[in-house]
Curated annotation (Swiss-Prot):
Superkingdom assignment: Bacteria
Organism: Phytoplasma australiense
Predominant location category: cytoplasm
Name of the protein: Small ribosomal subunit biogenesis GTPase RsgA
Homology family: Belongs to the TRAFAC class YlqF/YawG GTPase family. RsgA subfamily.
Family annotation (CDD domains): YjeQ_EngC (cd01854)
InterPro entries for the chain: G_CP_dom (IPR030378), P-loop_NTPase (IPR027417), Ribosome_biogen_GTPase_RsgA (IPR004881), RsgA_GTPase_dom (IPR010914)
């Protein structure tokens, strides 16, 4: 059997790219697949865990009569459910500065979820041509706060502004384009790969959100790597976080924990001696970052019906 990368799934057909000769083939799944591992003698060993194929999977395939069949999925280094994709190297998180307007609340929620999956994140802000210069400079100044942890790019995909500097980050990686519907992911992909078969989304004036054109994740070969276009996000769930552990996903908070009376047990909310709140008052933490944290803590408390003594 040979190895291939799953680059697309459509109507029961998997489009796979052979890892040796780069040929793109159409294949079908052979019965119920099981998670596979290679052992020392290079023989295939199956366990009982049933698996569904995701875009980004490395699979074993072979010819059966007149068609190609996928027999097994090799171990994944990571995976997401929304979007449904595996073996991600980095996430290009795209935000629109207008239509829909940029919100730090949405940014921080995305960052939490992606950090929970231990994924490297690069921030891209689109539609810079539709915003006033002064407003753009203000946003850039606020985003400098995130710069020690995340690289930021500002682009106008239609005019190719800022696109050139992006091209080198894709080499030898599977990069996922992620973001809210209508932020310009498909337009950005079109700017990077002009022959990508995409339709630019129209923005619904009545709802202020984009209409779906990307139905399923798909990998596009680019600069010796792959870019994954994914469906837009309409809902982000914090169900994987707890009231106690959310703070651990704020790298900018961690350096102030030593100044908290309760140390790593401090929730940075109502405690009287809190290094994070002290850093906030000193301007070392931007107000939106902390207020979003409090909002998420309240969201988790309501969702999990946690009762906190005042």
């Amino acid at each position: 059997m040979k190895k291939a990368l799953v680059i697309r799934f459509l109507a029961g057909i998997y489009y796979i790219q052979d890892l040796d000769n780069q040929t793109i083939l159409k294949a079908q799944k052979k019965g119920v697949l099981k998670k596979s591992n290679f052992i020392q003698d290079n023989q295939l060993k199956n366990n009982r865990d049933k698996m569904s194929i995701k875009v980004g999977d490395i699979v074993l395939y072979g010819m059966c009569y007149d068609k190609y069949l996928i027999y097994a999925i090799l171990p994944r280094k990571n995976e997401l459910k929304r979007p449904n994709i595996a073996n991600i190297d980095q996430v290009l998180l795209v935000f629109s500065l207008v239509k829909p307007h940029f919100q730090t609340l949405l940014l921080d929620k995305f960052l939490l979820i992606l950090q929970q999956h231990k994924l490297d994140v690069i921030l891209v802000f689109s539609k810079i041509d539709l915003i006033e210069k002064e407003e753009l400079e203000e946003i850039q100044q606020n985003m400098n706060y995130y710069f020690p942890f995340y690289t930021c790019y500002y682009v106008d995909s239609k005019q190719q502004i800022g696109i050139g500097v992006l091209k080198n980050i894709f080499e030898q990686k599977i990069t996922v384009l992620a973001g809210q519907t209508g932020v310009g992911k498909s337009t950005l992909l079109k700017a990077l790969i002009p022959d990508a078969n995409l339709k630019t989304q129209e923005i619904s004036e009545s709802l202020g959100r984009g209409k779906h054109t990307t139905k399923n994740a798909q990998l596009y070969l680019f600069n010796n790597g792959f870019i994954a276009d994914t469906p837009g996000f309409s809902k982000l769930d914090l169900g994987g976080f707890s009231y106690q552990n959310l703070k651990n996903f704020y790298p900018d908070f961690l350096k102030y924990v030593d100044n908290c009376y309760f140390g790593t047990n401090c929730l940075h909310l109502q405690e009287t001696q809190c290094g994070v709140k002290e850093a906030l008052t000193q301007g070392k933490i931007i107000p939106s970052r902390y207020s979003n944290y409090c909002y998420f803590m309240e969201e988790i408390k309501k969702e999990k019906k946690i009762y906190v003594k005042n």
